[in-house]
């Protein structure tokens, strides 16, 4: 198994943002097809540049693996007559399988005998099979967009200009539209001499490197990182190197060469976030910050060119000239924005539509203010947090109409903080404005102030409630308003801040603030859907924290709205999983649950309690429930478990000595209702029937 397959699809420049997805498809589809075609191999390597997608398969077998197929036919008694001769059914089946009836085999299946057509498929030479496999591989690309060329006969993400297909040193017959496969590739668009002959699949990467192409994107990325870090070290700096930018730059070049540029220090008067964003989004540059103080932006940048260092000084000067124009624009935006306060910009929110059915962003902020008051009341937060929070909410969206945010939307909140500080707002208000968008993505930091925490929660609650209210909810992989991420953010914030409150009350308030004409269903129905939606996010996060799914479900089943309480209870229940106490609780709960389902859930009438055992059970229930509720109120979960475990003996004695299903319906219903209330007492903590052994 020393064969090597090379498949290179050469194109015009591919959009950088789509290349990672194409790499993943090529890896997965090629592996699946090789398995489907029964071709053994050692490893697959997929590589990509802006102008090519490459598949390299090493250690290919000479031949496909042979296989045996079995096709079941009619039952034996139908296939053969009493003399053992094949019937028309057997003959017809054999003909359909292209075998002689005498070659049919009899095998047993689920205790019954059938005839089978058994055939061995001999493996073909891989060299003969691979063209068909690769032709199928080409058709499997799921393209985000398509271009057509050659009178619309051919289509791909970008026009295909060459095709290399080698099995060792032999060209395999293959075509993509009108492009025929050969052993001729192309080197770097500007540095190479054009056509590159690949004499052997094994030497592909080496030959391409000699033609100024680093085909392996992983090697290319490491090269870019090393070059950037080396230049940054020269300035005693650290590069701002977000993965998305590094990945995009990587797929813009075939031969990277990094260069160090600078800009006038006067631009450092602009908030660094605006400068960095301008460099990254417009120019694909890497900003540099002080190695000792990452909050200090330095007047330097690193750019990566697609070429060598020839004429690098001219390239540097050109990059600096372009950046100077960009930063001048940013300075103009900043100066214009700071001429008026954030408060004065609130009026402009009336002309920005939030959602057509729900009016303007100003109306959204008004709803947020009402939600903020509700949450502040629930949490019993007083001054100065109350007034500072409501101020932060009022100004939270006021930076949306600014020039800077209009140019760079992802700076929303960040610029609001800067502008609020310039115009003398309280520091907690400034931070609350920027923090209310947190977390912006998975793994992002959370709000660090209570003002930011409350503002963030009410913003996300309004976003989720308003979207569900008008029927814009996530479905499948579609989540255009990032509602799943926002629900996850709410749960993360609640767990981080240990805020124990019911989301049901807050979401109900949010829905009540939406015009009735915009609602697609009754509020109660929408509320249930929202709480179930948040419950799934809670379930995910609890599990990521190491809690077992069954224990998570047991607590969320009885209270999906109080996220922190459910988490605390699940955390303690996990520690009790193998304890005798939890086993006693589960056993007792199972006994009462089965009968409780027959109860009407009415009050227990003490005058109908006749047996001393049931009287004792009832009084113990009242006593235990009082202690249980007190324990749960103070988050004394261990004590609550002990209370319920100690209740088991009373339940056992009751079932041993008292007949529940007596003929007297009044007595029967009263006893069933007692059992029902005991079950509900247990459910104050969890649904113990969900917890597995």
UniProtKB/Swiss-Prot annotation:
Q: What EC number(s) would the UniProt record show?
A: 6.1.1.14
Question: What Gene Ontology cellular-component terms does the record carry?
Answer: cytosol
Task: Kindly state which keywords UniProt assigns to this record, in alphabetical order.
Answer: Aminoacyl-tRNA synthetase, ATP-binding, Cytoplasm, Ligase, Nucleotide-binding, Protein biosynthesis
- State where it is primarily located: cytoplasm
Spell out the reaction equation it catalyses.
tRNA(Gly) + glycine + ATP = glycyl-tRNA(Gly) + AMP + diphosphate
**GO: which molecular function terms?**
arginine-tRNA ligase activity; ATP binding; glycine-tRNA ligase activity
- Reply yes or no: does the keyword GTP-binding apply: no
Instruction: Tell me where it resides.
Output: Cytoplasm
Name any Gene Ontology BP term: arginyl-tRNA aminoacylation
Transmembrane spans:
none
State how it assembles: Tetramer of two alpha and two beta subunits.
Q: Which NCBIfam families match?
A: glyS
HAMAP family on file: Gly_tRNA_synth_beta (MF_00255)
The similarity comment for this entry is: Belongs to the class-II aminoacyl-tRNA synthetase family.
Q: What is this protein called?
A: Glycine--tRNA ligase beta subunit
**What species is this protein from?**
Natranaerobius thermophilus (strain ATCC BAA-1301 / DSM 18059 / JW/NM-WN-LF)
What is this organism's lineage? Answer: Bacteria, Bacillati, Bacillota, Clostridia, Natranaerobiales
């Amino acid at each position: 198994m020393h064969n090597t397959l090379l498949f290179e699809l050469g194109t015009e420049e591919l959009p950088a943002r789509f290349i990672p997805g194409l790499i993943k498809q090529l890896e997965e589809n090629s592996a699946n097809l090789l398995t489907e075609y029964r071709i053994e191999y050692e490893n697959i390597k997929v590589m990509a540049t802006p102008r090519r997608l490459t598949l390299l398969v090493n250690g290919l077998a000479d031949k496909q693996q042979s296989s045996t197929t079995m096709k079941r036919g009619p039952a034996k008694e139908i296939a053969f007559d009493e003399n053992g001769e094949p019937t028309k059914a057997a003959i017809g089946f054999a003909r359909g399988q292209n075998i002689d009836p005498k070659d049919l085999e009899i095998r047993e299946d689920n205790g019954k005998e059938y005839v089978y057509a058994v055939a061995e498929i001999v493996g073909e030479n891989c060299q003969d099979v691979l063209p068909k496999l690769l032709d199928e591989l080409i058709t499997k690309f799921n393209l985000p967009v398509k271009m057509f060329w050659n009178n619309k006969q051919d289509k791909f993400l970008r026009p295909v200009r060459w095709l290399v297909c080698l099995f060792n040193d032999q060209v395999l017959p293959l075509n993509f539209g009108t492009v025929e496969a050969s052993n001729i590739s192309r080197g770097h668009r500007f540095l190479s001499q054009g056509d590159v002959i690949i004499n052997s699949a094994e030497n592909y990467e080496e030959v391409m490197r000699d033609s100024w192409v680093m085909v392996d994107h992983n090697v290319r990325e490491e090269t870019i990182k090393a070059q950037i870090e080396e230049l940054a070290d020269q300035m005693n700096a650290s590069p701002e190197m977000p993965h998305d930018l590094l990945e995009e730059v990587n797929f813009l070049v075939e031969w990277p060469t990094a260069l160090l540029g600078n800009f006038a220090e006067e631009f450092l008067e602009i908030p660094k976030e605006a400068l960095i964003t301008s460099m990254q989004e417009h120019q694909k540059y890497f900003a540099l910050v002080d190695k000792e103080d990452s909050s200090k932006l330095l007047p330097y940048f690193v750019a990566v060119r697609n070429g060598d260092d020839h004429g690098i000084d001219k390239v540097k000067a050109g990059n600096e000239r372009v950046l100077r124009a960009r930063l001048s624009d940013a300075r103009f935006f900043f100066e214009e924005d700071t001429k008026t306060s954030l408060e004065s910009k609130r009026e402009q929110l009336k002309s920005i539509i939030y959602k057509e059915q729900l009016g303007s962003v100003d109306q959204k902020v008004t709803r947020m203010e009402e939600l903020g008051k509700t949450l502040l009341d629930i949490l019993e937060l007083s001054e100065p947090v109350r007034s500072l929070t409501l101020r932060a909410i009022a100004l939270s969206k006021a930076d949306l109409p600014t020039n800077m945010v209009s140019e760079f939307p992802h700076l929303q909140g960040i610029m609001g903080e800067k502008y609020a500080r310039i115009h003398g707002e309280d520091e907690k208000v400034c931070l609350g404005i920027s923090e209310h968008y947190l977390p912006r993505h998975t793994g992002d930091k959370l709000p660090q102030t209570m003002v930011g925490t409350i503002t963030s929660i009410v913003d996300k609650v309004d976003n989720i409630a308003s979207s569900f209210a008008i029927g814009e909810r996530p479905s499948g992989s579609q989540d255009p308003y990032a509602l799943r991420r926002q629900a996850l953010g709410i749960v993360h914030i609640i767990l981080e801040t240990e805020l124990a409150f019911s989301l049901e009350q807050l979401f109900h308030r949010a829905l009540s603030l939406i015009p009735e004409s915009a609602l697609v269903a009754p509020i109660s129905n929408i509320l249930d859907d929202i709480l179930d939606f948040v419950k799934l996010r809670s379930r995910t996060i609890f599990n990521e924290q190491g809690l077992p799914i069954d224990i998570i479900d047991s607590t969320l089943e009885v209270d999906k709205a109080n996220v922190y309480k459910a988490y605390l209870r699940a955390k303690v229940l996990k520690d009790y999983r193998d304890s005798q106490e939890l086993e006693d609780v589960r056993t007792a709960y199972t006994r009462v649950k089965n009968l409780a389902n027959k109860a009407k859930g009415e009050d227990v009438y003490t005058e109908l309690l006749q047996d001393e055992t049931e009287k004792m059970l009832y009084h113990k229930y009242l006593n235990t429930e009082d202690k249980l509720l007190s324990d749960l109120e103070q988050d004394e979960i261990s004590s609550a478990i002990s209370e319920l475990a100690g209740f088991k003996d009373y339940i056992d004695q009751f079932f041993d000595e008292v007949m529940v299903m007596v003929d007297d319906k009044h007595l029967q219903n009263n006893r069933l209702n007692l059992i029902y209330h005991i079950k509900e007492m247990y459910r104050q903590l969890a649904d113990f029937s969900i917890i597995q052994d």
